[in-house]
């Protein structure tokens, strides 16, 4: 009986947080520049069970890419819904959620299959990973917090 109690307590302690407020560190306006493209990512405060966000890339004064997303607490856990270029949302479930780092995964999606966010050196970093044309592929972004 005592072993069962300790096992249950351990499982609870090691389970990733399922409340969106655990991702409050994402909130704010973030901006950066990469290869001549100005990038911005904006996340709302974690309220009402969701974080809402958007990303925009501007090059030569024109928007060349955008994405809407939300992170929501659903029965299966924290889920990131990505809508690149305004397409229907694709869900990615949180497989890791710790202080200043979160990893979402959808192994059934073509690309990416993983989305990672983390804080480091006072900057927000994101990385997507997966397979393209049978080869491992990834892309990474870095933004600085804006006023």
Region spans (language model):
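Central antiparallel beta-sheet cores of small beta-barrel/beta-sandwich binding domains
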Residues: 26-27, 32-108
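Edge beta-strand at a domain terminus
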Residues: 94, 99, 119-125, 129-147
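Charged, amphipathic alpha-helical segments
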Residues: 110-113
């Amino acid at each position: 009986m005592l072993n069962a109690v300790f096992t249950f307590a351990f499982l609870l302690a090691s389970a990733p947080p399922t409340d969106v407020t655990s991702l409050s560190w994402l909130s704010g306006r973030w901006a950066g520049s990469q290869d001549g493209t100005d990038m911005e990512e904006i996340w709302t405060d974690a309220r009402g069970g969701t974080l809402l966000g958007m990303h925009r890339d501007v090059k030569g004064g024109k928007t060349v890419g955008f994405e809407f997303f939300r992170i929501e607490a659903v029965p299966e856990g924290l889920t990131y819904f990505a809508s690149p270029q305004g397409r229907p949302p694709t869900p990615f479930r949180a497989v890791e959620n710790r202080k200043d780092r979160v990893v979402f995964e959808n192994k059934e999606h073509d690309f990416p299959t993983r989305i990672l966010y983390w804080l480091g050196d006072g900057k927000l970093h994101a990385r997507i990973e997966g397979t393209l044309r049978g080869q491992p592929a990834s892309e990474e972004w870095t933004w600085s917090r804006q006023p």
